[in-house]
């Protein structure tokens, strides 16, 4: 338990409020660069991965100077970021509302360090699951695992929702360059029957493997979709004994798994200390291991492990994810920014913003502190994004000339997996990556607009205020190790935010109420009687649905 109730009680928070009024509110990044030729060197860090690959994190275009950053670091120390971080890595129950450890970092403990939780070491248990995943994924990839007619598997369908879907979807898309030709992965998450129907309509039951991803094996959407998939399969296979060759479970509920018809040998478990939004590192990542191969999946884990060690051992003033989190707090709580933009200049990363939405907004979308009092300050930001250059032709107008401050992260790899046309496409992509962050910073003033020939009432329409903050993240190449490090960077950034706001970033009570009400309404939809048990709007909507349903 932190020693403070509210972040606003911290002495450094009050000092930062004064600093914002005296310096931050009028801070000019352009002027800061003009005054300090070494600003880029002072506010950028090169992260070195376990395989010697590198990622450059450039924070120099943000609205801070050294004094402000020093104050933010002091705030982190006062808030106990280091203490909470160390408690997480020690396996303590920092998820206080559910009395659980938060130990996803143990899932990528490839150095097999001692990482006990509740008096039990996790290293061997995690390694055993990974060995099982390797054996299974290798057998799918080499064709030795066959379906009920003796044919090799060509299509793997992961059925899950939330963290059991978003992580595997994002990672398989991001690492598609490492996939095996002829082996495809598909994902079903939405309870909308269209998602299941469209996914299955071109698949062959004889060569399809289903992975049912549900920790409890009772998640309503997942089990409904899984049952529909089983019925689709049995319509061709006929005999339920064939389920064993075509279904595996990523779950901890052996009783329900076996009752479904899945062989217990094809069940891959994980512990209660694995939160859904952090579960891609666990057995939930089996679809990833099958798609890109276990060695690449292991590199993915090791990349995350390397960022974990950086976060755990690096002083806060040079700690890359901590700095990212501190900047987020600075904009959110002192500038009043409500959103954060993430733009990957990489088509393979097109699902990365959606993945980060869950990580950030489910973790820090809280209004009660760990001291059980309501906050008197903003917490979780609204995170959004799309890949560039597409994004430049949609919402970048608002980012450049709108009335809202939208801090942004831009992500680019120097080396493309597809350097077509003598790398012309990648150089064009890179030129936009560099140009957008520069344009957001420098803007365009009235004099320059007039110098370019604009006159009269057109002039203000072509002005750009600039001074819009960006963080540029430049990797050498998007490899499994690089992606692992990038995800872990955002995990620990999110952790830092939550620690400063003194909220529990590891529960998600907000998703429960709607699910409970949906069960009640689901029963009401089973008959044709008009309902009158809700508010007038909900009654009206339900009754109109019943009238139009058939």
UniProtKB/Swiss-Prot annotation:
The active site is at 362 (proton donor), 393, 515. CDD domains: SIS_PGI_1 (cd05015), SIS_PGI_2 (cd05016). GO terms for biological process: gluconeogenesis; glucose 6-phosphate metabolic process; glycolytic process. One of its GO terms (molecular function) is glucose-6-phosphate isomerase activity. It catalyses: alpha-D-glucose 6-phosphate = beta-D-fructose 6-phosphate. Its EC number is 5.3.1.9. Its main location: cytoplasm. It comes from the Eukaryota. It holds the Pfam family PGI. Pathway: Carbohydrate degradation; glycolysis; D-glyceraldehyde 3-phosphate and glycerone phosphate from D-glucose: step 2/4. It is found in: Cytoplasm. D-glucose 6-phosphate binds at residues 163-164, 214-219, 358, 362, 393, 515. It is an enzyme of class 5 (isomerase). One of its GO terms (cellular component) is cytosol. Keywords: Cytoplasm, Gluconeogenesis, Glycolysis, Isomerase. In the cytoplasm, catalyzes the conversion of glucose-6-phosphate to fructose-6-phosphate, the second step in glycolysis, and the reverse reaction during gluconeogenesis. Belongs to the GPI family. Homodimer. Has antigenic properties. Elicits a specific immune response in systemic candidiasis human patients undergoing malignant hematological disorders. This is Glucose-6-phosphate isomerase. The lineage of its organism: Eukaryota, Fungi, Dikarya, Ascomycota, Saccharomycotina.
